[in-house]
């Protein structure tokens, strides 16, 4: 029997570190190809490679995905207004299909026979990875160690890692599970599993506690071109740099902390803590610019599309014809979404200070209540009669109702 060559989505965290050793034991003689994608998370690449090799990987591949992530994933979600259940900007969920694609690309190039990930059997990510694998490499075998192995808790994994000298940062005193990329950080496990327990200070990774944030506010001007952020405070910037800077400014001012109970793909509710300063600010600014530039029916209908798009991302069906169809609709709506939004960041809050656009549909002469008013008030009477005619007729016929 030929030996397996297994491509592992490797993060260097507890699960994937333990997983390499476990796979080596289960598939005797297997060659492990560790693949790490850079989505903007903090990491020490040299140490990561050393850790992977020391843990048992035959080779290590590091793929810089940041530019692709911003331009082909994040901006699409932002333009769509994709916030899962009106809160979560989908940082982890957005990164999974791109990481899956990177893993498949390396696996095919290296002649691997199997794909594997470090996702739990009751989480969302197993669905996201495996649905992506099915779309991109349907012929390849997939193994999910966390659904098979003997460990039933993170504490047991930590003990296993210590027994086998596997270097991991998680400890029994620091049990948080953390996933990070440039669009946000997710934190779960430990005391956070009790929805009545306020997140301890050490759970937050980048944001300042609002009460400890600067006493002076930070004002930012964000410019968009057809729905895409292109400049910050008058300076043209690449998307990656703009997000990095907004993360810094937002985090400094305590902006971007999210605490939600969300509905997972597998049917359970989970408590999630997120830090997403740039994502929170940009979604807020983008929506306000849309209010100014989109025709009423488009603006209102697009809110439904945003929810559909968020569900699609969250549920792991990024590589679907539906996403492409929604992209076409969204791109059409974004043609007039050009302009600037001014926001004040202060002690955990965002306050809209102003917005402007060459495509603004706001007509001050029609909206004003001063003598400059050009609205034809006499037209209102006839409009109201026609507008309410259906209801009037209904209630004349159905007097008891």
Swiss-Prot record:
GO biological-process terms attached to the record: argininosuccinate metabolic process; L-arginine biosynthetic process; urea cycle
Record-linked SUPFAM superfamilies: Adenine nucleotide alpha hydrolases-like (SSF52402), Argininosuccinate synthetase, C-terminal domain (SSF69864)
UniProtKB keywords: Amino-acid biosynthesis, Arginine biosynthesis, ATP-binding, Cytoplasm, Ligase, Nucleotide-binding
Chemical reaction(s) catalysed: L-citrulline + L-aspartate + ATP = 2-(N(omega)-L-arginino)succinate + AMP + diphosphate + H(+)
Annotated GO MF terms: argininosuccinate synthase activity; ATP binding
Principal place of residence: cytoplasm
Entry EC no(s): 6.3.4.5
Localisation: Cytoplasm
Positions with a binding annotation for L-aspartate: 120, 124-125
Pathway assignment: Amino-acid biosynthesis; L-arginine biosynthesis; L-arginine from L-ornithine and carbamoyl phosphate: step 2/3
CC annotations in GO: cytoplasm
Positions that bind L-citrulline: 88, 124, 128, 177, 186, 262, 274
Enzyme class: ligase
Residues annotated as binding ATP: 9-17, 118
Subunit record text: Homotetramer.
Alphabetized PANTHER family for the sequence: ARGININOSUCCINATE SYNTHASE (PTHR11587:SF2)
Entry's family note: Belongs to the argininosuccinate synthase family. Type 1 subfamily.
Name under which the protein is recorded: Argininosuccinate synthase
Organism annotation: Chlorobaculum tepidum (strain ATCC 49652 / DSM 12025 / NBRC 103806 / TLS)
Taxonomic classification: Bacteria, Pseudomonadati, Chlorobiota, Chlorobiia, Chlorobiales
Gene: argG
